[in-house]
Amino acid sequence: MDSSAEGSGNGGSKTAERTVKSMNVYKKDTMKNLVKDNSYVGRGIVIGKTEDGTKAAVAYFIMGRSENSRNRIFKEEGEDVMIYPFDASKVEDPSLIIYAPIRKLDGKLIVTNGDQTDTIRDFVVAGKSFEDALETREFEPDAPNWTPRISGMLTFADGDFTYKMSILKSADEAGTACNRFTYSYKAIAGVGHFLHTYMGDGSPLPTFTGEPERASIPNDIDAWTKEIWENLNEQNKISIYVRFTDLKTGAVENRMINKNV
């Protein structure tokens, strides 16, 4: 490189260094701040460990803009959660709104935004992996949005847990290929990761980009449920489900809110 080229780029390099130094890659934010300014987060998964390190925390919520999307409620079925129509007479397309977002297996908890929950369950039961299961699935066929499939799985062992998260999204505007991203985490007290389908409202809807966002996980399940629910867009939010699992005893606490009651 000649000296003139090196000198001309020096100022930009120093600016870039200052920018990088000012960034905190370990910063986490409250769920309030992560959702309050986004009118359409879509569907969201949060997984992490409470601040005191004693519980695994999972949250799943759904939002909707159309009458078909908003016509949904969460229902508990044993240790699983199902999504059903609130008014069956108004169902237009049941394929993308009726599914089990949460399923419990021995030593594992699966949470997703679609029927890939059952794909993951079936593969795990057969001795295969989270990644193997999702290699068989793609983003949703709802052109032009190509809504990504987001998934998570907690694995409990020795009084602690690890977790994986995945997003399957379209490689281009035409939906010609699927890009698959998987993230693997060791649980850290007070830290969670938040993965959601959309960056905001739009036409088409802008797909989530980047890594799962780092979120704070408090000790109080009621406070955390309220924090997320009250800061989701009032017009578009539909339901939320939160589960805390005690890492020593396995005891479970659940909170569920349905806008349709």
Where are these predicted regions, by residue range?
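N-terminal amphipathic/basic-hydrophobic helices that include classical n-h-c signal peptides
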Residues: 1-22
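Conserved short alpha-helical segments that host acidic/polar catalytic motifs at enzyme active sites
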Residues: 20-261
